[in-house]
Amino acid sequence: VQGQNFAYFTAQTQPPEVLEGRHYLPSASLMAAEYLSAEEEQGFFLVIEGSQIDWAGHANDDHALVKELMDFDQTINNLLNFARKRGDTLVLVTADHETGGLAIDEGSKIGRLKLTFNLNDHTATMIPVFAYGPKAELFSGIYENTDLYHKMREAMGWEAKESHTYRPSR
């Protein structure tokens, strides 16, 4: 990618769903990481969103949700391979909420899940953070999602900032 001109055109409003033919997230994400790593000697920060996962949850569309998750899984796989090769790249995977109250029903089998949605809005389900690479250990345990900011600053070796996370008094 270095030294070359390129353009990546996407939807003007919402990106289309995988079921509508959108298959560029894995390749576009890897292209962005490769481009930024070639251009930026001091490192880079890249945010990639699988936004249609949320919309499939709102629609309670299990087929679309599974397809979107598979697409995002391929995106993550590409970026983990990129990070493994470089050795200096931290990959974080998380979300800001769960949508739909998704549950796996009794009687599900490998390759044949029975899924149920409990609502069509956001839930208060705890959201995991998966980390791979240098300083990944900073992201273990249970913490407020707003603490991600401070953990990322620490991982990058930046000066600590005062946390404004609400902590109820005991």
Question: Where do the language-model regions lie?
Answer:
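Feature captures the catalytic ectodomains and active-site-proximal regions of enzymes
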Residues: V1-R170
